Curated annotation (Swiss-Prot):
Family: Belongs to the SAPAP family.
Organ and tissue specificity: Expressed in brain and testis.
Keyword Membrane: yes
Source organism (scientific name): Rattus norvegicus
Known role: Part of the postsynaptic scaffold in neuronal cells.
Protein name: Disks large-associated protein 1
Highest classification ranks of the organism: Eukaryota, Metazoa, Chordata, Craniata, Vertebrata
Effect of residue 990 to A: Abolishes interaction with SHANK1
Length: 992
């Protein structure tokens, strides 16, 4: 027996005695809680502890067992069992038999804690890796376990006899232990053979191999990180790597490495330096802090966290929360020795354990980490919900360039990510894609940005985060991390909100196609981030955001990166309230002159688009989608502009046709890559959507933006996007299209959230398409009659016009449109005058309207044209600003309204066959046909008419001033919409 113990100690290499000493000291520790300073984790490998227990600490351990509430928590618990069995056999053989039954559970629990390092068990773990998820296999495992238990009982009886013989000696105690161990299923058989071998050669892992397996269990149990990584024993010899990593005993880990060739230094978090590729392979546990497999995965994924740092941190954290934090189920999951190996029946019974067993196969590939049973179970359920497969983690190809930070991040995030619903298999994750693609965006924009800047995050930062995450991961759900790792389906996984969005879009099938495409091409590691935006502003459903990357997000601690400081590869579209959209865009737009597509246009809205890149990509995608193949040939910028509105004028005739087909209050647009856009566009152009859903799939970015109709409608109403787009196209070319157009681009085009014309007054945009070139449809701007109608909407439109397009080009186009329209009216009225024998009063009206229009065009229009030209001339000394132009244009609007009302009246008379209006109208609005009898009445009606016009003008001016004030207020506030909502609404409520 002593030889056996000696061999064991040898096997451990010197650590045994120290372990024994420490064990003896620790025998007093009844709780199995190990503080980081505890000798058990740090000083003793689990197996060394066993040695000490067996040889020297038999008595003390038995005591703690009785006292300890959770014997499994005690290092001594197993010893106690063993000691008890040793003692009991002398006293009562039957009692010994009972002990197995009574203490079997505890013993099982304790075994991992004891960490005798049964390599076989650890190796079994490897075997477990190959186990399939099939219930049959699980059943088989359970059955085998039961057999093993039965067998262990019989063996236990035999061992008891041995124990009786050797009980007095520590060796005897060891022997008893051996019997106990064998009791744990396969351990018995293996330990026996091994014990013999060990007697022959102390260094041989025979006895120890079985112990090591137990140790593997224990180490698994001890090391939450290992558990989190689903520590698979990559190799039987690796079983002890845990001991090193978990115990953080580099020395003992190295010594133990004798039994574990690989374990050598790698097992110790402290010794990560010694990790070799092979070591990593087998003892990747300790080195990567993930299961060796996991670690390999990470290495492949360049997720190789700073091994030393990670290991040390993980070890320390593990030590701090080691044993208690990993549930029994989990450690058993790790330790599954193999189908025949000891897998506590009780644990196996647990569904989570079985699930874990089933899931472990997912980790079979070398690169896939092996989840603990609980982790696996969680992962499984999660997978069922999400279907993403991270099992391809094995193929996870995050380039090393991402640096350990990323690895750490990915590792630490795994759990959070899994919760976030990592869709993407890590393999699909492209480091560049992860960092750069908007998909990588996480729950909230800021977080996404932070994620996008993961590479930017300092390693220190990442490590700190990793530690915190690891703690949370270890304590809360190592399994989730594993889940993230093992998620089986690489395809993008859609959340419920997504389905909602799809329904909204009415593009479900299309969305599915996109999804299938994405899943089929994992390289598009776009986490599908979908934001649903409400009209009140951007309300992101973080739940809607899916991050499909192993490296995705912290669930709890978002990276410290400030939201806007980082590169903003991701598009986050904010639905701006209608009130907000025009003015804030205008403010942004002014600064944004050349950068219509730049994000600044939207910066005001809290959720404004994050990045030009995303915007442009989205714009292109939206462009392709909206315009279909026809628009694709357009320049990406121009296309983006046109895409900004569903009604945006099509730069091509095709687009006009498409728009006419599509005229809807709102359009759901799904934008995909150019390749897909053609197909998608074709189907979408024909379809009408009541709610706006935009799905943008950038190269690797797949997003859906949903705008509430009210928001988009208001926005659309605010801006005649068609004109805006047309002008914006030119302005983009000129790089001088600040104002709402810019915002339009930044928000709508760039976000590829196609703004939808929700409001009826924007029907012009669609209606006038035919009249003008695709580049610009002046008639859309202020339709002749609509101007009269628009008086009610004038404040809004005026504000929007003033706000939206402050560029000289824009105003010139507006001016030209007005001029063309007025000239058309004048020509029509003159023709009517010639062709018809009209009463004098009607002729007078016609002449008045025509004269006023001509005068306005000759004077004010001319002046305004000069102002616009000066605005466009950078050398003009008193160069008017876009605001000046907007103000002057607003003044023109008053005159235009008056004239448009006159022509409107003429049109009504024409519709009435040039007959006077109803008598009431005659009395109110004008004198009856001139009659010499009552010359006095002529002037009175004129006065009344003038008074009506003047009152209307005053009202229009008031509205205009109010609109201007509102616009200025919005300009002054970066969060105009938010403020207006938060401040004004409360006031209204108070009043109510």
């Amino acid at each position: 027996m002593k030889g056996l113990s000696g061999s064991r100690s040898h096997h451990h290499g010197i650590t045994c005695e120290s372990a024994c000493d420490s064990l003896s000291h620790h025998s007093d520790h009844k709780p199995y809680l190990l503080s980081p300073v505890d000798h058990h984790p740090a000083d003793h490998p689990y197996y060394t502890q066993r040695n000490s227990f067996q040889a020297e600490c038999v008595g003390p351990f038995s005591d703690p067992l009785a006292s300890s509430t959770f014997p499994r928590r005690h290092y001594t618990s197993q010893q106690e069992l063993k000691d008890e069995s040793a003692l009991v056999p002398r006293t009562l053989a039957t009692k010994a038999n009972r002990l197995p039954t009574n203490l079997l559970d505890q013993f099982e629990r304790q075994l991992p804690l004891s960490r005798d390092g049964y390599h076989t068990l650890q190796y079994k773990r490897t075997a477990v890796e190959h186990r399939s998820d099939s219930p049959g296999r699980i059943r088989h495992l359970v059955h085998s376990v039961q057999k093993l238990f039965t067998k262990s009982h019989s063996l236990e009886g035999a061992s008891k006899g041995g124990v009786n013989g050797g009980k007095a000696s520590p060796d005897g105690s060891q022997t008893v232990r051996y019997g106990k161990r064998s009791k744990s299923k396969e351990r018995r058989s293996e330990p026996k053979a091994r014990s013999n071998a060990s007697n022959a050669s102390p260094t041989s892992p025979s006895w120890w191999s079985s112990d090591d397996n137990l140790d593997g269990d224990m180490c698994l149990y001890h090391t939450p990180s290992g558990v989190m990584t689903m520590g698979r024993c990559p190799d039987r010899s690796v079983s002890q790597y845990f001991m090193g990593a978990y115990n953080t005993i580099s020395e003992q880990a190295v010594k133990a490495s004798r039994s574990n060739n690989d374990v050598k230094c790698s097992t110790c978090a402290n010794l990560p330096v010694t990790l070799d590729a092979p070591l990593l392979k087998k003892s990747a546990w300790s080195s990567t802090l993930t299961v060796s497999r996991a670690r390999e995965v990470y290495q492949k994924a360049s997720v190789n966290m700073d091994q030393a740092v990670v290991k040390s941190e993980a070890c320390q954290q593990e030590r701090s929360c080691q044993y208690l934090q990993v549930p029994q189920d989990e450690w058993t999951g790790y330790t599954p020795r193999g189908k025949d190996d000891e897998i506590p029946c009780r644990r196996m019974r647990s569904g989570s354990y079985i699930k874990a067993m089933g899931d472990e196969d997912s980790g079979d590939s070398d690169t896939s980490p092996k989840p603990s049973p609980k982790v696996a179970a969680r992962r499984e359920s999660y997978l069922k919900a999400t279907q993403p497969s991270l099992t391809e983690l094995t193929t996870l190809k995050i380039s090393n360039e991402h640096s350990p930070k990323l690895q750490i991040r990915s590792h630490s995030y795994l759990r959070a990510v899994s919760e976030v619903s990592i869709n993407r298999s890590l393999d699909s994750l492209d480091p560049a894609g992860l960092l750069t693609s908007p998909k990588f965006r996480s729950r909230n924009e800021s977080y996404m940005r932070a994620m996008s800047t993961i590479s930017q995050v300092s390693e220190m930062e990442v490590n700190g985060q990793f530690e915190s995450v690891c703690e949370s991961v270890f304590s809360e759900l190592e399994s989730q991390a594993v889940e993230a790792l093992d998620l089986p389906m690489p395809g993008c996984f859609r959340m419920r909100s997504h389905s909602y969005v799809r329904a909204i879009e009415k593009g479900c099938s299309q969305d599915d196609e996109c999804v299938s495409l994405r899943s089929s091409s994992p390289p598009r590691t776009t986490t599908t981030v979908r934001t649903i935006q409400s009209s009140t502003g951007v309300i992101k459903l973080s739940s809607a955001v899916e991050v499909s990357s192993c490296i995705t997000t912290y669930k709890k601690t978002p990276p410290p990166v400030p939201p806007r400081t980082t590169t903003k590869p991701f598009i986050s579209i904010t639905a701006q309230s209608s009130t907000e959209s025009a003015q804030d865009a205008y403010m942004d737009g002014q600064g944004q002159r050349g950068d219509m597509i730049s994000q600044s246009g939207l910066s005001n809205s809290t959720e404004s688009l994050d990045s030009m890149k995303a915007l442009t990509a989205a714009i292109e995608a939206a462009n392709a989608q909206i315009h279909g193949p026809a628009s694709q040939h357009m320049g990406s910028n121009a296309a983006a502009v046109t895409t900004t509105t569903t009604i945006a004028t099509v730069t091509t005739e095709d687009r006009k046709k498409d728009f006419k087909k599509n005229r809807c209050l709102s359009i759901g647009i799904q934008v995909d890559d150019a390749e897909e856009s053609e197909k998608m566009a074709e189907s979408k152009t024909s379809s009408k959507f009541q709610s706006v859903g935009v799905q943008v799939e950038e190269e690797k970015c797949f997003r859906r933006f949903t705008r509430s109709n009210s928001v988009t409608t208001a926005v659309q109403a605010d801006l005649d996007f068609h004109d805006n787009l047309e002008n914006s196209l030119e302005s983009i070319e000129d790089n001088s299209c600040p104002g709402p157009m810019a915002r339009q681009f930044s928000r709508d085009a760039s976000t590829s959230t196609v703004s939808i014309q929700g409001s009826g007054n924007h029907y012009h945009a669609c209606a006038a398409d035919d009249d003008f070139d695709t580049d610009f449809d002046p008639s859309i701007l202020p339709p002749p009659d609509p101007w009269i109608d628009s008086i009610t909407e004038d404040p809004l439109e005026a504000v929007q016009r003033s706000v939206c397009h402050r560029d000289g080009h824009w105003f010139l186009k507006l001016l030209q449109a007005e001029r063309d329209r007025m000239e058309g009216w004048c020509k029509q009225m003159e023709r009517e005058e010639r062709e018809n024998n009209l009463p004098e009063d009607i002729l007078g009206k016609i002449r008045t309207a025509v004269g006023s229009a001509q005068l306005l065009m000759a004077q004010k229009f001319y002046q305004f044209r000069e102002l616009c030209e000066e605005n466009l001339n950078p050398n003009a000394h008193p160069r008017p600003t876009s605001q000046d132009l907007a103000g002057f244009w607003d003044m023109l609007q008053l005159s235009i309204e008056n004239i448009s009302m006159k022509f409107d009246e003429l049109h009504q008379l024409k519709a009435n066959n040039w007959k006077q209006m109803d008598p009431l109208d005659k009395k109110e609005r004008r004198a009856p046909p001139p009659v010499p009898k009552k010359p006095a009445k002529g002037p009175a009606p004129l006065i009344r008419e003038r008074s009506l016009e003047s009152s209307q003008r005053q009202e229009a001016r008031k509205r205009l001033m109010a609109a201007k004030r509102a616009a200025s207020v919005r300009q002054n506030s970066a969060t105009e919409s938010a403020e207006s909502i938060e401040i004004y609404i409360p006031e209204a409520q108070t009043r109510l």
